[in-house]
Amino acid sequence: MPKPKNEGYLGNINVKRQGVSEEWTDDKVQEYLKCTRDPSYFISTYLKIISLDEGLVPFKLYDYQQNLIEHFNDNRFNIVLACRQSGKSITVCAYLLWYLLFHPEQTVAILANKGATAREMLSRITTMLENVPFFLQPGTKALNKGSIDFENNSRIIASATTTSSIRGLSVNLLYLDEFAFVENAEPFYTGTYPCLLYTSDAADDPAS
């Protein structure tokens, strides 16, 4: 379904700007509820990724990727040890986007050993967002290389792993990429963990 040009965010017709109303049908409501309840369904039905061989293609999850998503959704803490080019990072990006779209008032942080790595993941999330139908997008208030703010008051930030990366923030979901290569990992962890520990929803949120 084509997206109205005048409803896009700052000239990007594929990202819905804030303040755009949606005409809800019974089918849209049912589909929205289904996506809310099942991240794997939302990802495999609506998200697209860039393939080196085929360009933009639907994100068809392998069994192990579905298992990853289930673990993310069912457990507060997750550690993933996997080989390179196994599709783990793109799976994380897809899960984070689902979490942001269907969970209002949440703050998500992507931290990596290099700021460029974290921003690259945010860029992948933006590409996925651009292919989501408008009725599933909450509307975007701000979008740049380092963060996205949605109309449902959820937001995501990308930064390097330093002790002050997310200081002062209350983070509902934190993703640490390339953590094996983080220098001074212990002071970083002790400086970052309270941002999760003192988040009001953290104790109840299995995805944090």
Predicted regions and their residues:
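Phosphate/NTP-binding elements of NTP-utilizing enzymes
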Residues: 2-200, 208
